């Protein structure tokens, strides 16, 4: 990628923001070296790294990296068997401790099942070499500040103990001189140190009376710093102990350096991985700062930026726009007056493309797609170029000439005010010729111009689309909204009229205007009016659709309520019938018992035998209502009052789904069509829908009939399936399982579109739903809901 376009599109300013989040030298080196690349596999890998890091940032606050020093020079010295200083060893020890901490961090995430959602960072963490024995040796011997600990060796601890003893003895002896008779010889009753020896500040005139060794004097010469003769021997012994301490410290450092030397390659690998984690952390935190999203990469170079804004603008006030290029057209011509936002629009497309090819998330409010370009060229106008000043026509042309030598079908070209800076007629002609040349080379182009001659360019060139920036004539202010398909409209006369010019001036101006220009402006005005009308109608349709869905949901709830009431009525009726039968049976048994007793007393045999009496009792038993509706033959027979016939609307009891009878097979089974499915069903498993309706009485019957009349052609199954699924508050795995089950039900009921409500929250569930829908074959398309319908807290799904 050429370096000029990185400067022109302010790519380095994005990298500068990235550096705000870095804490390691290797991470900074990686950020400094960041460039757009063209390998789609590496780009997707980098984007997935950023996605993993964003998930860790949301769930754990990021990868817990400490600030690390650059230990690469230390490792090079170890490779030549040099002995490192305590500070250098402490810095290596800090890296090793961080290595262990990061390794344990990812192991814990894996144990918590979070690691299953991390596609690449877990694998990188598994390459860390923790070196526990070496880490422990350094941690025992040297603290984080570079001081050698007493526990570094037995000898060092012993020598330091003796040093402390001698220092205390010397201090006690010196304190005696600050009191009593000798105190009068001192400038101040304090003990100080000169040349590593304990001394007292003695007045110069008492030098002979005090005695001892003079080590220093004050600037005035009035005070001498004298070591009393009584502590000279102790001080000499203390110096000897300090020499031993230094020798032992050096031995410890040499021993630790020798222990580290075989592991320099592993430590260097750890440094690289930790630095890369620092860089990935920074990418995630930059994405969070910018409120950026992960783009999809299109190898066909189909760019679709949905609700995109320039990442260097304040996202709270920036106007987001939809920009598409490369699908049905490869050239966009943005016409219209200056100051309307044309330049920032083309810069947005160019910079977001560079960011995505660098593995960075892009500033869009809805899922978007970027291409893969070997080169991106940009010729940006002078007054609006932030970093580059190309002020003359010749410099623009020289820049474009250099581009043409490198343009092919894998190039994105950005022109700002193409052909400006010269005679308008010649400039417009040259602009058209340049655009034709670039198009013949197969490049993808987005260009801005204020030449009216180019307004017709998009209509008579293949794979070319007109566009413009919306201008509010009422407020005389640009809206910065990007409008595809409509060329820029000249508003000069309309603005002049609103500002107070009389009809005579406006009329004279119109008379001087070329008639074809007036016709073109009128045509553009008509297109804009039609577009506004379509937009208004779409909003009304969306509002009506939402109201219809709400009514459908209410009707579905009412139907469910009626079905429950019906079930209660049937249950109460069955209980009452069973009660009557039980009472009748009891009376019959009493009657039979009396007959038997009477016959026994009379010793007679009547015509009514014992078997006949039992048979009559059995008939009474059969009157009892069966508790299981599926096994109750009387109720089943009642449900099949009419003969089944093809075309009948029926209910399959085992599936609780409605369908239509197609034909009856020889084996007695019926072929039933339920939504997009067809299956064979036993006749006993089929209930006519009309029997269900007729079983209801009174007010419940009327309400049920009204519901059935108002449901759509897909029947009661469609009405009972809601057009939305609320996953808020549901755990991640359970939510995806529920989503899969819901899509099955919606497809079976032939419902589309449907709304998946996942909320905003941390964004983990939203990302999970998006990934699920992207790979699901049942999904035709999906997008976030409109801002007034939940925004990115809900996803609208079109099913196949």
From Swiss-Prot:
Locate the Smr domain: which residues? 725-800
Query: Annotated Gene Ontology MF terms?
Result: ATP binding; ATP hydrolysis activity; ATP-dependent DNA damage sensor activity; endonuclease activity; mismatched DNA binding; ribosomal large subunit binding; rRNA binding
Which GO biological-process labels does this protein carry? mismatch repair; negative regulation of DNA recombination; rescue of stalled ribosome
User: What InterPro entries is this protein classified in?
Assistant: DNA_mismatch_repair_MutS_C, DNA_mismatch_repair_MutS_core, DNA_mismatch_repair_MutS_sf, MSSS, MutS, MutS2, P-loop_NTPase, Smr_dom
Which EC number(s) are documented for this chain? 3.1.-.-, 3.6.4.-
Q: Which PROSITE patterns match?
A: DNA_MISMATCH_REPAIR_2, SMR
Q: Which residues form the signal peptide?
A: none
The residues that hold ATP are 336-343
Q: Which UniProt keywords apply?
A: ATP-binding, DNA-binding, Endonuclease, Hydrolase, Nuclease, Nucleotide-binding, RNA-binding, rRNA-binding
HAMAP family in UniProt: MutS2 (MF_00092)
**What quaternary arrangement does the UniProt entry report?**
Homodimer. Binds to stalled ribosomes, contacting rRNA.
Functional summary from the UniProt entry: Endonuclease that is involved in the suppression of homologous recombination and thus may have a key role in the control of bacterial genetic diversity. Acts as a ribosome collision sensor, splitting the ribosome into its 2 subunits. Detects stalled/collided 70S ribosomes which it binds and splits by an ATP-hydrolysis driven conformational change. Acts upstream of the ribosome quality control system (RQC), a ribosome-associated complex that mediates the extraction of incompletely synthesized nascent chains from stalled ribosomes and their subsequent degradation. Probably generates substrates for RQC.
Q: Which NCBIfam families match?
A: mutS2
Indicate the family of this protein. Belongs to the DNA mismatch repair MutS family. MutS2 subfamily.
Protein name (database record): Endonuclease MutS2
**Organism encoding this protein:** Leuconostoc mesenteroides subsp. mesenteroides (strain ATCC 8293 / DSM 20343 / BCRC 11652 / CCM 1803 / JCM 6124 / NCDO 523 / NBRC 100496 / NCIMB 8023 / NCTC 12954 / NRRL B-1118 / 37Y)
